[in-house]
């Protein structure tokens, strides 16, 4: 199934996880990518974390222009899509959070178990100056 490419052209934080049925499947997939004649796909894999005891590949970047027509972004999308095409047990979840707080999610495969890996938390923080304390003379 072709992943819907999300158009978030301004600065975004992006994270995804690809889950395989087994660690062996994940490792075989990594080797397939390394032997492809596609430098963008190899670079996308190099930007991912793969050194897990679990059968997953993860990616996170922040404050990036995530244009869907950029070759680097297309490569990351292809990495997720190809894993699901090759392995019926595979699935992925991707979350993109724009600088305006807009959140977009996409997933493929049986990804209920991937919700714990990527989630957003909205919070309000302040850095007000310290309140001047009155000193009372007794």
Report each predicted region and the residues it spans:
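Short, extreme N-terminal segment that most often corresponds to the first beta-strand
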Residues: 2-34
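Charged interaction segments
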Residues: 32-138
